[in-house]
Amino acid sequence: MLNLVVNREIAFSLLPLLHQFDRKLLEQFFADGLRLIHYDVMDHFVDNTVFQGEHLDELQQIGFQVNVHLMVQALEQILPVYLHHQAVKRISFHVEPFDIPTIKHFIAQIKQAGKQVGLAFKFTTPLVNYERLVQQLDFVTLMSVPPGKGGQAFNSAVFNNLKQAHKYHCSIEIDGGIKLDNIHQIQDDVNFIVMGSGFIKLERWQRQQLLKTNQ
């Protein structure tokens, strides 16, 4: 029998509900102990577009806190939607489209709005190249799949960035391909574990066991 005790907070990625938002299912997840939603926003930085501010009010009504993950190029236009919404607790954005001065500008903007700020990294982007910036952050989002769509397989190349992230004093969120058969490989190294399709496919009793540490 799989060990379902995970001593890290689970964040449910909303991507599996992209084409059919299911409030009743989310209310069930909340009743089971889920408290954190991972909310992906995409533009042409990746080969997909998803949520653009939809459902935040409903998520707040249910009681969720929201981590917003911005996989975007047009950050100047997209960011304001999330800066002042009460449900949004943390905002991370990808470093790859931007130079260092631009990244610093957006970090300051997010901090000024009172949100926790993070930078997101593809597993092919060396974290060490952004060391000084990472030291200013509340958290980092480390991608363990190529960004842009759900249901992909976990890529162990993320361990390079994971090892580097431990040298800094910020929380670590890992995102992509996490399922019951690999969650224990990374749980001791991170603070937040993002699960999408791997979470929604669980039996309810499995979700409840997995979420015990959220309560």
UniProtKB/Swiss-Prot annotation:
The active site is at D40 (proton acceptor), D175 (proton donor). Its EC number is 5.1.3.1. The keyword Metal-binding applies. Transmembrane segments: none annotated. Its cofactor is a divalent metal cation. PROSITE patterns: RIBUL_P_3_EPIMER_1 (PS01085), RIBUL_P_3_EPIMER_2 (PS01086). InterPro entries: Aldolase_TIM (IPR013785), Ribul_P_3_epim (IPR026019), Ribul_P_3_epim-like (IPR000056), RibuloseP-bd_barrel (IPR011060). One of its GO terms (molecular function) is D-ribulose-phosphate 3-epimerase activity. Keywords: Carbohydrate metabolism, Isomerase, Metal-binding. Binds 1 divalent metal cation per subunit. It comes from the Bacteria. It catalyses: D-ribulose 5-phosphate = D-xylulose 5-phosphate. Pfam families: Ribul_P_3_epim. Substrate binds at S13, H69, D175, G176, G177, G196, S197. A divalent metal cation binds at H38, D40, H69, D175. Pathway: Carbohydrate degradation. GO terms for biological process: pentose catabolic process; pentose-phosphate shunt. Belongs to the ribulose-phosphate 3-epimerase family. HAMAP family: RPE. Catalyzes the reversible epimerization of D-ribulose 5-phosphate to D-xylulose 5-phosphate. This is Ribulose-phosphate 3-epimerase.
